[in-house]
């Protein structure tokens, strides 16, 4: 049984830029500021056997603000700083109606199929309603970091915490559920 922690990127692993109350991705590697407790919190999860997989919407690719190469370079930078096993990227915008853009669970399902992950034994950590809904739709337990920017949530998180360290503590204290495997 492979367990995973799926992580949103912007606002969870690196600083999100909030403008008019909404979070935005950094535009350059120089703006990629890794949150202070990320490396230690993720190392603890990794030591306990969790696969660490980033699941990130990057609509600036579809909008023409960033190229896939620029986004990949930022992801490579993040991966050089943190113990990540994979980074799943949705390059689409809402109007593309794809299956991978959170709140749809496509990024999580794709990684679960490829990595043999038991979604019922896994977690999604995010800072927005999209992350929580994607996690619930995939069959994962969910953790909201922060206040969700005042957004309305259709699905409530299993835990609402302030930091990635608190999220790691909570995840590591959750029991392994029995007979609830979610085959992919």
Predicted regions and their residues:
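Conserved Lys-Pro-Asp/Glu-containing loop-to-beta segment of HAD-superfamily phosphomonoesterases
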Residues: 99-130
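Non-catalytic pre-domain segments flanking phosphatase-related domains
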Residues: 1-9, 17, 85, 169-184
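Substrate-recognition element of Asp-dependent hydrolases with the DxDx(T/V) motif
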Residues: 38-71, 75, 84-96, 135
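Short, electropositive alpha-helical surface patch
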Residues: 61-79, 102-114
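Active-site neighborhood of HAD-like aspartate-dependent phosphohydrolases
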Residues: 1-51
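Structural recognition of alpha->loop->beta junctions
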Residues: 74-89, 94, 153-173
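Acidic, Mg2+-coordinating phosphoryl-transfer loop and its flanking beta/alpha structural elements
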Residues: 125-162
